[in-house]
């Protein structure tokens, strides 16, 4: 049979293609018609219904498959997290817990507070299940007549309500209002600093050199136009980083006859002393003017080391001194970017460069530190340098005019923050400071929580020591009154004392108390909106860290315990305020340094030829080399931090109490803050210490 030709089939095929069809009519009264889509009337309805039903079934199956996969992934992540926690805790040594020493007063107070909170929570739970829901109403109705008293336990509970409302709530309200005022004042100060930084960026304000100094074509000459520069590298048992810091300093682009490097080694380990001495000898043989100094009597920590080095007779021939800690790696043009700022500025005493971190992305702890330090350098140091010509010397990556050091009294051993001490005394003597935000020096941040905690304790106890010692000198100095007010009110009180005081008191003491005393409940904007806004301001200098805003906020509240304890120790001269512990380094290098080192070793090995050596001696040498290459296995340990753990249980207890009172925001804040304290207390953040 011949195939049947149907115009309807042809029309259906053309309409399925979706090709636009334009029909033109000769009569101008007709308009142009454009057909875009096929007519739905030609589509078979029964088949589409069957097809849609199958599609729905397949969609449901796909969604179920995705849900199962998601649950499997969550379970895998959860079990892997538990496994890593178990492995970390398995390394906890019986003696690896935190030593409280004379600072155990804070831990004892937290324990007492925790026991009282657990007792009150148990009492509240009994009352809750008995149906005494008085605490759900902020305006509590306390039974007064004997007819309303149901039992002896009910009588005790009513007595607790009366005691709470009449005697406990009023002082807590007063303290919370005081802390909220301090919180708002500090927030305004932080906001003003950010506005000042934006103004500097908008106006492109920065210290500039008037002309090009020390041209490269004059470098091969006598170098008489180059000032004499002394470079000091203080170190103490810095096995991991001594080599890269000495190497970087010895490659500074400066005439050799105008530069002297002092390696100030305070190590008490003879093997480390020998390593550093060999490194100095190696660079000395290459023509670098470098000296190794080791003190037999190690007093005064870093300040004593620097003071001893400045007492050498040959220092009188030098005009400037650059200081680098053992983990700092300056670029070769560092001196050419900093020293020219001193020319024709006799009042300038210090040029400070910015820190850059080679290990900022190593773990969560280093990322959170990077947020804080970026704000410190980008905002605080830059704004104070531009508008006040004064800021706290960071202790390293800076160049001092030696005359300014001498007129200010030199390095003193009275505190553990000798850098801030010399900066304040130089400011009182009228010297000005310059901060260079675009000159960066590579360094490390602590990768373990233990090292970071010790560093922060020293950084926050020292300023309080210094404040006690310098207050009279500030009041009797000849500087302007507004400079005295800035030093006392802003530099010391607001940013060094008030900040750790209110952050710990408000979020770690008052907030959990108010869960058991609902008459003094904190408003939501205090615990949620304002802290998030301030965290956003802190993250602005490091925009890539924006995903870590919530961990940053929680971790900063966790660190308030250490900072508050350090502040009190320094203010009242407790034992730990005089403790100096060298921050543990990992010895990280930049990627370019690692690549250069790899190339150097690969070129060195094939060209090594040993002559005049027998086969047996070659075998012994190879065995010794293999032993040197084998890494020394050092067991890493976890530490238990008692104060953080006690506060974790306290906040979680308060979270349970807030759950009974149906306080949503307070519950979630206390829950996540308590879990953060728990993770930190178990040393589950950062690397483990070896």
From Swiss-Prot:
InterPro entries per the UniProt record, alphabetical: Glyco_trans_2-like (IPR001173), Nucleotide-diphossugar_trans (IPR029044)
Binding-site list for substrate: 325, 327
PANTHER family listed in its UniProt record: GLUCOMANNAN 4-BETA-MANNOSYLTRANSFERASE 9 (PTHR32044), XYLOGLUCAN GLYCOSYLTRANSFERASE 8-RELATED (PTHR32044:SF70)
Assembly mode: Homodimer.
Family the UniProt entry places it in: Belongs to the glycosyltransferase 2 family. Plant cellulose synthase-like C subfamily.
Enzyme class: transferase
Subcellular location as annotated: Golgi apparatus membrane
EC number per UniProt: 2.4.1.-
Gene deletion effect: Normal xyloglucan (XyG) levels. Plants missing several xyloglucan synthases (e.g. CSLC4, CSLC5, CSLC6, CSLC8 and CSLC12) have no detectable XyG levels and several associated phenotypes including reduced stems height and leaves area, as well as shorter root hairs and reduced pollen tube formation ability.
Gene3D superfamilies: Spore Coat Polysaccharide Biosynthesis Protein SpsA, Chain A (3.90.550.10)
Active site, per annotation: 266, 419
Gene Ontology biological-process annotations: cell wall organization; plant organ development; pollen tube development
Molecular function (Gene Ontology), one example: glycosyltransferase activity
Tissue/organ expression: Mainly expressed in flowers and seeds, and, at very low levels, in seedlings, roots, leaves and stems.
Name of this protein: Probable xyloglucan glycosyltransferase 8
The entry's keywords: Cell wall biogenesis/degradation, Glycosyltransferase, Golgi apparatus, Membrane, Phosphoprotein, Transferase, Transmembrane, Transmembrane helix
Primary subcellular site in the record, as a coarse category: Golgi
Role, per record: Probable beta-1,4-glucan synthase rather involved in the synthesis of the xyloglucan backbone than cellulose. Seems to work simultaneously with xyloglucan 6-xylosyltransferase. Xyloglucan is a noncellulosic polysaccharides of plant cell wall and consists of a glucan backbone substituted by xylose, galactose and fucose.
């Amino acid at each position: 049979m011949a195939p049947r030709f149907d115009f309807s089939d042809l029309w259906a095929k053309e309409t399925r293609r979706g090709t636009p069809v334009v029909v033109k009519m000769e009569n101008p009264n007709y308009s142009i018609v454009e057909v875009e889509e096929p007519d739905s009337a030609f589509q078979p309805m029964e088949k589409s219904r069957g097809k849609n039903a199958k599609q729905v079934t397949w969609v449901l199956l796909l969604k179920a498959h995705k849900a199962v996969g998601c649950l499997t992934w969550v379970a895998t992540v959860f079990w892997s997290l538990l496994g890593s926690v178990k492995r970390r805790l398995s390394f906890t040594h019986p003696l690896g817990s935190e030593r409280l020493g004379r600072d155990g007063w804070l831990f004892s107070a937290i324990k007492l507070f925790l026991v009282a909170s657990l007792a009150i929570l148990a009492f509240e739970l009994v009352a809750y299940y008995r149906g005494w829901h008085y605490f759900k109403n902020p305006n509590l109705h306390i039974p007064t007549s004997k007819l309303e008293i149901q039992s002896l336990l009910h009588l005790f509970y009513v007595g607790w309500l009366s005691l709470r409302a009449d005697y406990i709530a009023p002082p807590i309200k007063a303290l919370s209002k005081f802390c909220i005022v301090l919180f708002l004042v500090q927030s305004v100060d932080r906001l003003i600093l950010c506005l000042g930084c934006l103004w500097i960026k908008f106006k492109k304000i920065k210290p500039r050199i008037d002309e090009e100094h020390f041209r490269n074509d004059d470098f091969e000459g006598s170098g008489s136009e180059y000032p004499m520069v002394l470079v000091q590298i203080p170190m103490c048992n810095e096995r991991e980083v001594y080599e890269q810091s000495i190497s970087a300093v010895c490659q500074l682009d400066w005439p050799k006859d105008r530069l002297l490097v002092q390696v100030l080694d305070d190590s008490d380990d003879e093997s480390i002393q020998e390593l550093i001495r060999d490194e100095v000898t190696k660079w000395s043989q290459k023509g670098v003017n470098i000296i190794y100094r080791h003190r037999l009597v190690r007093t005064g920590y870093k300040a004593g080391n620097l003071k001893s080095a400045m007492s050498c007779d040959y220092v009188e021939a030098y005009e400037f001194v650059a200081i680098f800690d053992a983990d700092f790696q300056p670029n070769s043009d560092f001196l050419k970017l900093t020293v020219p700022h001193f020319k024709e500025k006799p009042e300038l005493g210090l040029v400070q460069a910015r820190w850059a971190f080679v290990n900022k992305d190593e773990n969560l702890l280093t990322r959170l530190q990077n947020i804080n330090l970026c704000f410190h350098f980008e905002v605080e140091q830059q704004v104070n340098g531009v508008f006040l010509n004064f800021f706290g010397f960071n202790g390293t990556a800076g160049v001092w005019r030696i005359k300014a050091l001498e007129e200010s009294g030199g390095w003193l051993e009275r505190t553990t923050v000798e850098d801030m001490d010399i900066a304040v005394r130089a400011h009182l003597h009228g010297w000005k400071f310059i901060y260079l935000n675009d000159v960066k020096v590579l360094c490390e941040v602590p990768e373990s929580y233990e090292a970071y905690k010790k560093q922060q304790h020293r950084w926050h106890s020292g300023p309080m020591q210094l404040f006690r010692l310098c207050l009279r000198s500030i009041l009797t100095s000849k500087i302007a009154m507004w400079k005295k007010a800035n030093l006392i009110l802003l530099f010391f009180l607001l940013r060094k004392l008030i900040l750790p005081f209110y952050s710990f008191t408000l979020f770690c003491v008052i907030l959990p108390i108010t869960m058991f005393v609902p008459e003094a409940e904190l408003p939501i904007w205090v615990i949620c909106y304002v802290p998030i806004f301030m965290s956003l301001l802190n993250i602005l200098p490091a925009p890539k860290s924006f995903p870590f805003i919530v961990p940053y906020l929680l971790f900063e509240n966790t660190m308030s315990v250490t900072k508050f304890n350090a502040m009190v120790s320094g203010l009242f001269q407790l034992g730990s305020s005089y403790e100096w512990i060298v921050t543990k380094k990992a010895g990280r290098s930049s990627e370019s340094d690692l690549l250069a080192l790899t190339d150097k070793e690969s070129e060195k090995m094939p060209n090594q030829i040993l002559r005049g050596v027998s086969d047996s001696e070659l075998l012994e040498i190879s065995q010794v080399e293999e032993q040197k290459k084998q890494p020394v296995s050092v067991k890493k340990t976890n530490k238990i931090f008692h104060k953080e753990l006690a506060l974790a249980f306290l906040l979680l207890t308060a979270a349970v109490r807030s759950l009974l009172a149906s306080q949503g925001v307070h519950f979630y804040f206390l829950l996540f803050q308590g879990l953060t304290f728990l993770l930190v207390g178990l040393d589950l953040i950062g690397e483990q210490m070896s």
